[in-house]
């Protein structure tokens, strides 16, 4: 029968000047669409390190972590196994609008979008939920004049 395999990934919702970073992935014709940057935890890494590394590897962006947002969980099947995936998400701040999608990771486009645009672009509903949660955290920090004040964090 199918084996159940647990997998852990980490990713980031990256914001610069109120806009959110999303990536267009075209994965070997298996699926394509707009996604948030994320990837698998490597041996010896903590979740924050994974999230920062994956954001940098997939987008070229060097971001800073502001806070933990939460996790999304979902299951998918491969011919051999059932994969139970947990993704830990961090709210991050970039220092410019620069991004460069990494083609070797199947990313063909990237950019910073206003919240409602990014929300509608995203392919997966669990990523839409995380985007909304992260954006609301950002708005709260901004309202309290804490966004961009790195000393506070």
Could you tell me what each predicted segment is?
Residues 3-36:
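N-terminal strand-loop-strand
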Residues 27, 66, 70, 105, ...:
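Residue-level detector of alpha-helical recognition elements and their boundaries
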Residues 1-4, 152:
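Short, low-complexity, intrinsically disordered N-terminal peptides in bacterial proteins
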Residues 11, 19-21, 47-48, 68, ...:
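A generic structural signal for ordered secondary structure
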Residues 41-129:
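Unchanged
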Residues 123-153:
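Charged phosphate-binding loop/patch that engages nucleotide di/tri-phosphates or the phosphate backbone
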């Amino acid at each position: 029968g199918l084996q159940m395999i647990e997998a852990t990934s980490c990713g980031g919702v990256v914001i610069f000047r109120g806009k959110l970073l999303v990536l267009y992935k075209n994965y070997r014709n298996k699926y394509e669409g707009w996604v948030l940057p994320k990837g698998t935890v490597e041996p010896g890494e903590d979740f924050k390190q994974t999230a920062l590394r994956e954001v940098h590897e997939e987008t070229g962006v060097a971001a800073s972590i502001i806070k933990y947002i939460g996790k999304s969980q979902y299951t998918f099947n491969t011919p051999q196994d059932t994969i139970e995936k947990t993704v830990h998400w961090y709210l991050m701040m970039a220092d410019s609008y620069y991004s460069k999608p990494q083609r070797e990771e199947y990313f063909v486009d990237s950019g910073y979008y206003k919240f409602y645009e990014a929300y509608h672009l995203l392919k997966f509903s669990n990523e839409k939920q995380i985007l909304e949660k992260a954006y609301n955290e950002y708005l709260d920090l901004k309202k309290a004049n804490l966004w961009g004040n790195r000393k506070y964090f």
